[in-house]
Each structure stands twice: as structure tokens, then as C-alpha cells.
Regions:
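Extracellular and organelle-lumenal recognition/adhesion modules and their flexible linkers in secreted
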Residues: 22-286, 304-306, 319-332, 339, ...
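Acidic, Ser/Thr/Pro-rich beta/coil linker or hinge segments at domain junctions
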Residues: 597-644
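Conserved, mostly hydrophobic/aromatic
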Residues: 44, 131, 231, 298, ...
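Catalytic-core region of carbohydrate-active enzymes that cleave or remodel glycosidic bonds
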Residues: 297, 391-392, 398-401, 419-422, ...
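Solvent-exposed strand-to-loop "edge" motifs in beta-rich extracellular domains
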Residues: 132-136, 177-179, 538, 579-581, ...
Length: 657
């Protein structure tokens, strides 16, 4: 991701507000079948920014569960006699705590965990606590969820006891069922046994039992459901800038994210410190949400997985020194990582990496079809590193499609340099990114009309409408995204994938906005941009249908009254998407050409997204403040009339009878 200086935030809005109401005739050509729309056309992109993984989609409620943060007790408060040791049972997570009798009957030993901005719990729901532990003699632990802000006689809202008994490390489990709903509870562990006893604790974990698909140690249900409800065709992960790392040592390494969660090593998160004005010193990656879980989620929601791997370049925004990057002649381990990932996803269960997948519970291949190499890279440094990756992958896995990059900008010198390089190298798709202002989105209605159809396909991998002084989610920005997406759809022969970014944000832990889905510890809401994405996905269609006004694409051009439109066909249904970026109601005439003899078009329904609250969105308090509404839509024949509200987006559904 790259930030841009946005200029003239109201220029584009004012430029279309003067458009007057008019009768706009759309000519819709049904004579010939247009370009097929790929199943991957609309999808999602996950990056661990804004506490998207730990504290977000990954449902673990304990922060620093294995005491591996640089400050081993960050997230914890200790009382009594607590030591941190580093010869634990898990090689890549060696730290643990030793609790010892404090030596006085009125003193206590134990520890509290604060969770991620608190621990959200719901009255009557079940929570699964687990810990790896050992002791020389039996030790009783009291496990509690507490409300330290309570004015009641007791802080605890539920408690259970477990007995640690054995010199060898073993996992112990209890269930907790709180009698209150709290957004900011605390997990407390009391050592009750006295007499000089001690107990060692490692990998202390707390999960809701009600996770996505009911998986133990799984995903937060409401957030995963928000992804499934988008019906995405492609799922890009895990980034983004974290793929590169601030330095190569801290890049995202997929091999560290598979296998037992207890032995997945901690990694820093570059979004902890990238923006000093929004600094989060407790933001790390536990890798509990790893590549197996990403592949599994892709399968759950019916999306093709698109993993992105390091090309050997650290973040170029943060590193001017060539020595920060891997020399081209030393790329072999990075290339092998890519080949091994394909084996992990697709290899037989008796192969080296396929066996790890099988041991994790998925003996069948994940049927990986795409892989991305590099993120927002630029200059000759990138293509000279990408080339050996492409050669190696083509040789070993010729059917895998490779995604390259056009860099962080939507136009300019680097963009113009990288596109020919991607063609020369034979990349299958090129990832374009654009976080741009109002006027850019209004000016891009014909962006892809003149792209070379003989080269790589386009992946619009990161985009969102940003506005100076209004860099938050708001309705008008979402409307302009909807307008821009008509160009993606109309050019589906060259644009094969598109994903909004970023995906997730915690209301107390964000570094970047706007974002698609927001949440606190108990609630979540879907933004207006989420509903735009869903409408495009639900009414994706199978093939593009030609739609013009005065012989030109309806793309906000001169004389088109701020209208953007596209049309697709699915069987006997036609879906027409129209964005009205003017402040006037617009009359529409749909003129259908090429209907078979005696066939007519029948209006079925319309879905309208409309609001006069241009700079508002949904929120935790008002999650359905602005949402699409299904309305009636009448008419039958070769010509059908409709109207569209000012500053609104509509999907018109018609049936060929």
C-alpha cells in the first residue's frame, strides 16, 4: 500500500452536480455473446493490518499467549512469584512462565491477560481455555474471566479449576461460561496450591466455542461470515506489505505458519510502527492464522486462493540500500519456497509438504491455480528477480498462473516501465493498485478500453476511493467505487480479478482507512463499500453485454449526465448496473436490440443503494444506516423505462421471455 497526496477533494463532485435531469437512452446489444466473466472477477484481499488477524479474524482472545513478544510479559499483569524461562517444549516458541507459591498465606501468585483491547465475552456462551503445563506435584489453578470495572461484590463472571499433575508437558483444558456480556473482560489465572509448589505454563489460550464452521481454535464467526456473504471468486493473501517486510528477516514466511500452532514462531508486524502517528507497540503476528487456514477458508467460501510470496525484495519504501535485498544469484531459497508452497497446496499426501497438509487434516489437494510473486515492487530490481521465479515455476508447474506487479502507482513512469516488463516475462496477470481521490475515480470510466488484449490480464488487486479531509468510509466514496467498477465489468475480457483493500479494521486498532469491514470485540458492521462489492458479486453474470449511449460506453463521458453503466447476462437474465454521480434524478430508457422473434424483456426487480448522507456510513451503533433496498421494477417489451435517484447506484434485473 502507498499513501498519496490527494488534491481538490470537491472538484469532481462539483463537476457532476451541475448535470441536469435528462432522458438517457441505453442501447443494449443482445445479438452476440460478449466476453466471459471469470469466476475470479470479484474477490477479497486479506492483509494483517488494523488487527485483521490476531484481535480480528483469528478468534484467539489471549494476547502474547506463548510469551514470545520482545517484552515477554507484554499483555500480561503478574502478581506474586512469576518467572519467565526459555527452555520450553516448543523449539520455536521456547518461553514460558513458572508460578511459585509466594510464601505467605495472604499473598497470591498468578497472572492476568488483557486480550486485544480487552476480551469480548457473551453471557451464556462457551469459551474453551487451554494451557500446556507441568508440575512436580499436583497444582490446582483457578481460571477466571473477570470484570475489573465491576462495582459488584465479586469481579469474576465465571471460573473453573483444573489440576496440573505430571512432570511432562501436557495440554489441559476447561470450559468457561460467563454470566455477563462484557466487551473488555480480563482472563485471570490463580495458583491455589501452596506448600512451596510451583507450576510451569506455556501457550495459554482462550477461544469462543462458537467459531466459523465450529472449528476448534478457529475463526471469528461474524467476520468469516461477512467474507462468505460477499461470494468472492478470488482470495488474495497474506498481503500486501507484510509479504515484503520492513526487512527480509521480518517478511512473511509461509513455512513458519503451518504445522502445530504451538510451534509457529512469532513475527513482528510492520504495521506496528509504520505510522508513528498511529503506533501500536503490541501488534505482532502469532501466525495462528496461517497458510493452511487461508487455504481452508478459501475452500469454505468458494474462492480461488491466491497466495503472494516474497521475491527477495524488502519494502522499497523503507529501504534505499541495495544491500537490504537478496542478490539475484542468491534467490534459490526464495524460489524453493514458492515451489514448496505449490507442493503444500497441491502435492500428494505422501510428498514432503503435502504430508504436512495432510497431517493438518486435509489430505486432498487444495487445487491451487494462482501464485503471486512480489507486492508493490518497482525499478529493474523487480523484473530481474521475478524472471528466475517464472522460469522455475513454469518448468515444475506449467499450469500455475503467475501474478506480477505494476508497482504502487496507477500510472506514471514506474507503471509504464513495469507493464512491458511483465509482458516480456510472460506474467499471466498484472496486479494494479490505486488508492485515489474522487476525481480519479470519476475519470477512469474508460481506463481499460484500450488495454492491449494480447498481453497479461489485469488484477485490480488493491483499490479504494480516498478523499482529502474525508479519509474515512463514506457513502459518496462508495458510490464512486461503484461507478469505476462498471469499467472493470465492461472490460472483463482483460480484467479478470478485482479486490478492494484493506479488508478488515478494529475500531480501536486501525492504522489505515477506509476499510471494508469494521468491528470491536463483540460486534461488526459492513460498510457501504462492502454492499457495493456484494452487489457486483451477486449479479456478476456469465458474459458481458454491450451497452452504449450515443454510440459510446456509458462511462461518465461528456453528455452522459454523470452516468456510468455496464450490463451482463446470466442465462435468460440481464443485469444492468447504473451509477448516477449527478445530483439530479435521471430518466433511463433501456433499448434492447437483438431479441429473438416474439421474445420480450420483462422487468423483474431492482436493487437500489441511495442516500442523501454523502459523508456518512454504517457503524457499530448503526450497522444498517445505509444499505441496498430491493424495489419493484415494471415494464415489458423491447424498450423499458426506469429512473435512478441522484447520487445513487442501482442494479436492474430483467428477464428474457
Amino acid at each position: 500500500m502507498k499513501q498519496f497526496r490527494l488534491i481538490s477533494p470537491v472538484f469532481a463532485l462539483l463537476s457532476v452536480l451541475s448535470a441536469g435531469a435528462a432522458n438517457n437512452t441505453f442501447d443494449i446489444d443482445l445479438k452476440k455473446t460478449g466476453a466471459p466473466i471469470q469466476n475470479t472477477m470479484y474477490g477479497i484481499f486479506f492483509e494483517d493490518i488494523n488487527y485483521a488477524a490476531d484481535g480480528g479474524l483469528y478468534a484467539e482472545l489471549v494476547k502474547n499467549r506463548s510469551f514470545e513478544f520482545p517484552n515477554a510479559l507484554q499483555g500480561w499483569k503478574t502478581f506474586g512469584n512469576v518467572q519467565v524461562l526459555d527452555d520450553g517444549p516448543f523449539e520455536r516458541n521456547p518461553h514460558y512462565v513458572r508460578l511459585t507459591d509466594p510464601g505467605h498465606a495472604h499473598k497470591h501468585t498468578g497472572l492476568d491477560n488483557e486480550g486485544f483491547f480487552g476480551i469480548g465475552i457473551v453471557r451464556g456462551e462457551q469459551y474453551n481455555f487451554s494451557v500446556w503445563a507441568r508440575s512436580e506435584s499436583p497444582v490446582v489453578l483457578r481460571v477466571e474471566l473477570v470484570n475489573t470495572a465491576s462495582m459488584g461484590e465479586n469481579h469474576f463472571v465465571c471460573q473453573q479449576r483444573l489440576t496440573v499433575n505430571g512432570k511432562e508437558w501436557k495440554q489441559y483444558k476447561v470450559t468457561l461460561r460467563p454470566n455477563e456480556t462484557l466487551e473488555k473482560a480480563t482472563l485471570r489465572i490463580f495458583m491455589e496450591t501452596r506448600g512451596g509448589a510451583s507450576v510451569d505454563l506455556e501457550h495459554i489460550s482462550l477461544f469462543p466455542a462458537d467459531t466459523w464452521k465450529g472449528r476448534e481454535g478457529g475463526l471469528r464467526k461474524d467476520l468469516a461470515q461477512a467474507l462468505a456473504d460477499l461470494h468472492p471468486g478470488i482470495f488474495r493473501f497474506p498481503g500486501g506489505c507484510i509479504v515484503e517486510g520492513t526487512d527480509l528477516e521480518t517478511r512473511y514466511n509461509w513455512k513458519n505458519t503451518v504445522g502445530p500452532v504451538e510451534n509457529r514462531p512469532l513475527n513482528e508486524n510492520r504495521w506496528e510502527y509504520t505510522f508513528p502517528h498511529r503506533f501500536y507497540p503490541d501488534y505482532f503476528q502469532s501466525y495462528g492464522l496461517g497458510f493452511f487456514e487461508f487455504f481452508q477458508l478459501s475452500e469454505d467460501i468458494g474462492a480461488e486462493p491466491l497466495p503472494i510470496l516474497s521475491c527477495g525484495l524488502a519494502c522499497q519504501f523503507q529501504n534505499d540500500d541495495i544491500n537490504a535485498h537478496v542478490p539475484v544469484d542468491q534467490l534459490d531459497p526464495y524460489i524453493q519456497d514458492a515451489l514448496d508452497l505449490i507442493e503444500f497446496a497441491n502435492g500428494p499426501a505422501d510428498s514432503k509438504w503435502g504430508k504436512i497438509r495432510a497431517d493438518m487434516g486435509h489430505p486432498e489437494p487444495f487445487n491451487l491455480k494462482y501464485i503471486g510473486i512480489g507486492n508493490e515492487q518497482w525499478d529493474a530490481l523487480y523484473p530481474e528477480r521475478l524472471e528466475p521465479f517464472i522460469k522455475a515455476i513454469r518448468k515444475a508447474y506449467p499450469n500455475i498462473k503467475i501474478v506480477g506487479s505494476s508497482g504502487p502507482n496507477s500510472e506514471g513512469d514506474q507503471f509504464d516501465y513495469l507493464w512491458p516488463e511483465m509482458k516480456r516475462l510472460g506474467a499471466d496477470l498484472v496486479d494494479e493498485h490505486f488508492y485515489r481521490p474522487y476525481e480519479w475515480f470519476l475519470s477512469q470510466g474508460t481506463r481499460y478500453d484500450n488495454y492491449d488484449r494480447k498481453g497479461p490480464k489485469v488484477f485490480a488487486g488493491e483499490y479504494a476511493c480516498h478523499a482529502t479531509g474525508k479519509k474515512w468510509n463514506h457513502y459518496y466514496a462508495s458510490l464512486l467505487e461503484a461507478a469505476f467498477m462498471t469499467d472493470l465489468e465492461r472490460n472483463a475480457d482483460i480484467v479478470n480479478m478485482a479486490t478492494y483493500a484493506p479488508l478488515f479494521a478494529h475500531v480501536e486498532g486501525w492504522q489505515w482507512r477506509p476499510d471494508l469491514i469494521w468491528y470491536d470485540n463483540l460486534h461488526s458492521f459492513r460498510t457501504v463499500s462492502w454492499y457495493v462489492q456484494q452487489l457486483y458479486s451477486l449479479y456478476k453474470g456469465d458474459n458481458v453485454v454491450g451497452l452504449t449511449m450515443n454510440g459510446k460506453p456509458v462511462a461518465g463521458q461528456d453528455g452522459q449526465n454523470g452516468l456510468f453503466a455496464s450490463a451482463v447476462r446470466e442465462g435468460n437474465q440481464i443485469y444492468i448496473k447504473v451509477a448516477n454521480t449527478s445530483d439530479k434524478e435521471q430518466q433511463l430508457t433501456f433499448n434492447f436490440n437483438g431479441l429473438k422473434k416474439k421474445a420480450v424483456m420483462a422487468a423483474s426487480k431492482r436493487i437500489d443503494l441511495s442516500s442523501d448522507k454523502l459523508y456518512e456510513d454504517n457503524s457499530i451503533e448503526a450497522p444498517v444506516n445505509i444499505v441496498p433496498v430491493e424495489n419493484g421494477f415494471d415494464g415489458k417489451g423491447q424498450t423499458i423505462q426506469a429512473a435512478i435517484n441522484p447520487l445513487s447506484f442501482s442494479v436492474f434485473v430483467l428477464t428474457i421471455e
